[in-house]
Amino acid sequence: MLSKRIIPCLDVRAGKTTKGIKFQNNVEIGDPVEMAKFYYEAGADELVFYDITASHEQRGIMIDVVKKVAETIFIPFSVGGGISTLEGMRAVLLAGAEKVSVNSAAVKNPDIIRQGSRAFGNQCVVLGMDVKHVGEKPGIASGYEIVINGGRSYTGMDAIAWALKAQDLGAGEICLNSIDADGTKDGYEINLTRLVSDAVDIPVIASGGAGTPAHLAHVLDQGRADAALIASMVHFGTYTVNQIKGYLHDHGVKVRKTW
């Protein structure tokens, strides 16, 4: 059995790391390059960066961050936010990222997944999914709907159906974020994670809601996720990565030993 991955997530706004709750009320918490170095040395298995104010004007700032991170750490990291073209993917990968994440852009143009996987390999293409629980309704059989544009726009797309389509198009991994749970520290959305993990054959990263090591143990076991994204619980010093890994190890979850 492969080790479960623990992945700190850094949201970057205009070159600075921020954190909010349910995509709102973001506060600045540090320099992304310094934080990347800290988490690398602290035992993280990977890192995820999201350019949350992605725009043409800000793109150069994020590329500069990616280059500096690639020079500083020696674990895989992915970058997402505002990447909507093959050229955008190429720029991020050439700057040093191992993976590129597409979210809203893939909903609007699903073929970007196919293009990216053919050009760079499916291991480089991560589908980011922002999901809200809306209950069963026509077109949303699972009760979970894909939302885009930072959670502001409902798409009418069922989360499970979209995950399966993206897998068929060539996505190599899914980062599954529950907006309902995001930043709450009340635990991951277990049912959603299990539904998606059971539906697809590619790795699923659970995101949104981590507050305690027990939450990670639950989503990696009962949610059947391959990896867990963490943010608030480590950004604000409540736990260290190695404390989390130690807890998981003690509770029967296989992790890469870094403590």
From Swiss-Prot:
Entry's EC annotation: 4.3.2.10
Recorded catalytic activity of this chain's protein: 5-[(5-phospho-1-deoxy-D-ribulos-1-ylimino)methylamino]-1-(5-phospho-beta-D-ribosyl)imidazole-4-carboxamide + L-glutamine = D-erythro-1-(imidazol-4-yl)glycerol 3-phosphate + 5-amino-1-(5-phospho-beta-D-ribosyl)imidazole-4-carboxamide + L-glutamate + H(+)
Enzyme class: lyase
InterPro entries xrefs: Aldolase_TIM, His_biosynth, HisF, IGPS_HisA/HisF, RibuloseP-bd_barrel
Active site residues of this protein: D11, D130
Domain of life: Bacteria
Pfam family of the protein (one): His_biosynth
Keyword ATP-binding: no
Keywords carried by this UniProt record: Amino-acid biosynthesis, Cytoplasm, Histidine biosynthesis, Lyase
Main location: cytoplasm
Molecular-function annotations in GO: imidazoleglycerol-phosphate synthase activity; lyase activity
Location in or out of the cell: Cytoplasm
Pathway in which this enzyme or protein is active: Amino-acid biosynthesis; L-histidine biosynthesis; L-histidine from 5-phospho-alpha-D-ribose 1-diphosphate: step 5/9
GO BP annotations, alphabetical order: L-histidine biosynthetic process
A GO CC term assigned to this protein in UniProt: cytoplasm
Keyword Lyase: yes
Similarity comment: Belongs to the HisA/HisF family.
Subunit-structure text: Heterodimer of HisH and HisF.
Main function: IGPS catalyzes the conversion of PRFAR and glutamine to IGP, AICAR and glutamate. The HisF subunit catalyzes the cyclization activity that produces IGP and AICAR from PRFAR using the ammonia provided by the HisH subunit.
Record protein name field: Imidazole glycerol phosphate synthase subunit HisF
Taxonomic source organism: Desulforapulum autotrophicum (strain ATCC 43914 / DSM 3382 / VKM B-1955 / HRM2) (Desulfobacterium autotrophicum)
Upper taxonomic lineage: Bacteria, Pseudomonadati, Thermodesulfobacteriota, Desulfobacteria, Desulfobacterales
